[in-house]
């Protein structure tokens, strides 16, 4: 018999591999609000089963750490035991022979140091975490929209009720149905079975089938006046809820139209502007006054707003571009992505027919710029990114969409300098090849590779490496600023300037649409409280009874798009919504966590805030 033979996995190995895959799905959809001590103990136990057991630190050290953590959870540990965990974990970290032991020890160290208060409470026999967690998808949504509720309503064909329920927490259901990054899906418990429910797709189905003219009740006038600086999603969200509470709201917007980055940062092929206009019209119909083309700090003094209004909400967007800081970046032909997208939002679509375009960046703005350039007639579009595709911050579907539109990815290339012709116009971008190096903060860092620079011909170079906030006027007025961001409390108030509130990009940096909506909602509550109000935003729509049928494994319905060769020639909508059959199947995949064991909705869901 030959000494070599083909090795096949045993049944036990195949079973263990399946269990590990199930565990991976559970870790990906890990909910918020769970006990950090229990999570740490579970991860240490998992790592201990993965070690080879040949070195003492892993074989004995991890077992001892797990035993000590069990004592913490049992309430039998003392303060000295917490110190023992820290000391033992440090010893394992520096002496383990493999990465499994080292990383397990680092997890234990991180836990006992970062959550020391939780460990001490456990030692006293108490735990601040309970089994009464919020529904994972609701907790994952920054605006805390009642997602299981509106999915049940969509499945029942009650689309207007679904939109009414969404608007209790988010006045932009249509905009989010088309462009939201859907963080709610990251914690969907359906991932335990197969894959997350397509929540955004179901929301879009409701928006596409609602009847026009959403009715909204407005409270009795309070006599209080509020100024909102910035007509983007955050500012309009605050205006919407403050108007519903009965306050008189005036929105100041420096552009010719409302919408902020929804209008001037997201192209029409992703979010049709007719839908955005309809949603904004609904908000302003509540009595919100709008002043367009007004730059606060230039056309009107901030002090005048302080004098004329009872409260002021500052919610300006990040409309300034970050610089590459390389030679030649100020040459004609080098344009900021935000400026280009802003021009498109104003209806000024440049003609790039026959041009070679290079886009620098790896975020959603870079993908929007690249895909827009293709629609503007560019002969070729190359996306240059200094890291790998896997490290890009853009949504995977946006990266796929750019490639299908005919854009080319150039990974691991960092901009070095811009080449110009004798007239000073950009003709090429030179890039320095990179290689992935050490991991910092959970993300691999690139470093220059020992390779010559590459020349990338380009008549237009679009820079999309991030945005800045222009907060100079507000800092001069006296609002506390750090790194161009206005500093505020978690409730959006500014203690240094009573009556002033802030949120959105200008408070925490460029973020997503749903984060801006969260900021506006939080600010509306804080402003109402500051003005002496105690108004509620309610929705008393009755949710259908839960379906008790089994949820068998079933594939996720994905949103289709028009063919790349067809859609890359125009700015018409790319994504195709679900059919009724697809909607019913996808809504039926929802596990109903608001009813079955997990959610805090048992005994009555939250109908007001």
Feature map (PLM): residue ranges:
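Feature captures the FAD/FMN-dependent oxidoreductase FAD-binding
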Residues: 220-221, 225-229, 277-326, 417-430, ...
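Glycine-rich dinucleotide-binding loop and its adjacent helix/turn
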Residues: 205-219, 278-298, 321-376, 481-497
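Local cysteine-cluster metal-coordination motifs and their immediate loop/turn environment
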Residues: 45-67, 90-107, 128-149, 171-192, ...
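Redox cofactor-anchoring modules in respiratory/redox and cofactor-processing assemblies
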Residues: 1-129
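Rossmann-like dinucleotide-binding cores of NAD(P)H-dependent redox enzymes
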Residues: 248-251, 255-286, 290, 370-417, ...
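N-terminal Rossmann-like FAD-binding beta1-loop-alpha1 element of flavoenzymes
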Residues: 224-250, 366-374
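FAD-site-proximal beta/loop scaffold in flavoenzymes
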Residues: 330-354, 439-510, 514, 543, ...
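A conserved FAD-binding loop/helix module that cradles the flavin
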Residues: 506-537
């Amino acid at each position: 018999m030959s000494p070599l033979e083909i090795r096949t996995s045993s049944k036990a190995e195949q079973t263990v591999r399946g269990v590990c895959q199930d565990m991976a799905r559970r870790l990906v959809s890990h909910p918020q609000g769970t006990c950090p001590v229990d999570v740490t103990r579970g991860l240490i136990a998992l790592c201990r089963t993965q070690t080879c057991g040949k070195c003492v630190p892993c074989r004995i050290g991890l077992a001892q750490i797990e035993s000590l953590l069990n004592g913490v959870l049992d309430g039998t540990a003392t303060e000295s035991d917490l110190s023992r965990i820290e000391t033992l974990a440090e010893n394992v970290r520096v002496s383990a022979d493999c990465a499994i032991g080292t990383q397990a020890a680092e997890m234990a160290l991180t836990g006992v140091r970062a959550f020391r208060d939780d460990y001490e409470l456990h030692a006293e026999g108490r735990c601040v975490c309970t089994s009464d967690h919020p529904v994972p998808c609701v907790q994952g949504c920054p605006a805390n929209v009642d997602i299981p509720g509106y999915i049940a309503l969509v499945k029942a064909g009650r689309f207007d009720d679904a939109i009414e329920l969404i608007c209790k927490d988010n006045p932009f259901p249509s905009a989010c149905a088309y462009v939201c990054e859907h963080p709610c899906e990251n914690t969907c418990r359906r991932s335990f079975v197969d894959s997350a429910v397509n929540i955004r797709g179901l929301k879009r189905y409701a928006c596409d089938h609602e009847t026009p003219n959403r009715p909204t009740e407005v409270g009795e006038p309070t006599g209080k006046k509020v100024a909102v600086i910035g007509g983007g999603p955050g500012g309009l969200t605050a205006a919407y809820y403050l108007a519903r509470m009965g306050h008189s709201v005036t929105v100041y917007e420096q552009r010719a139209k409302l919408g902020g980055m929804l209008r001037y940062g997201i192209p029409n092929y992703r979010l049709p502007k007719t839908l955005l206009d309809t949603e904004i019209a609904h908000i302003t119909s509540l009595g919100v006054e709008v002043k367009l083309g007004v730059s606060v700090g230039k056309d009107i003094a901030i002090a005048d707003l302080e004098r004329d209004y009872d409260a002021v909400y500052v919610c300006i967007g990040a409309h300034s571009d970050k610089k590459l800081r390389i030679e030649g970046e100020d040459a004609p032909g080098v344009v900021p992505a935000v400026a280009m997208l802003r021009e498109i939002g104003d209806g000024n679509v440049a003609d790039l027919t026959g041009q070679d375009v290079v886009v620098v960046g790896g975020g959603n703005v870079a993908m929007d710029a690249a895909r827009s350039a293709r629609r503007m007639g560019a002969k070729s579009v190359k996306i240059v990114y200094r890291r790998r595709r896997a490290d890009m911050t853009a949504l995977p579907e946006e990266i796929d969409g750019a490639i299908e539109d005919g854009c080319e990815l150039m990974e691991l290339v960092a901009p070095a300098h811009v080449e110009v012709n004798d007239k000073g116009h950009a003709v090429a971008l030179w890039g320095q090849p990179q290689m992935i190096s050490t991991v910092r903060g959970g993300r691999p860092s690139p470093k220059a590779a020992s390779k010559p620079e590459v020349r990338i011909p380009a008549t237009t170079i679009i820079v999309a490496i991030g945005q800045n906030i222009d907060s100079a006027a507000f800092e001069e007025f006296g609002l506390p600023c750090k790194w161009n961001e206005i500093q505020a409390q978690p409730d959006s108030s500014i203690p240094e300037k009573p009556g002033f509130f802030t949120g959105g990009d200008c408070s925490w940096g460029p973020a997503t649409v749903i984060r801006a909506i969260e900021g506006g909602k939080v600010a509306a509550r804080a402003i109402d409280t500051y003005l002496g109000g105690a108004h509620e935003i309610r929705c008393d729509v009755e949710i259908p009874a839960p379906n008790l049928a089994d949820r068998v494994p079933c594939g996720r319905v994905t949103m289709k798009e028009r063919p790349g060769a067809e859609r890359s020639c125009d700015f018409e909508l790319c994504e195709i919504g679900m059919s009724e059959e697809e909607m019913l199947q996808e809504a039926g995949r929802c596990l109903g966590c608001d009813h079955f064991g997990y959610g805090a909705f048992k005994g009555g869901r939250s109908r007001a805030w």
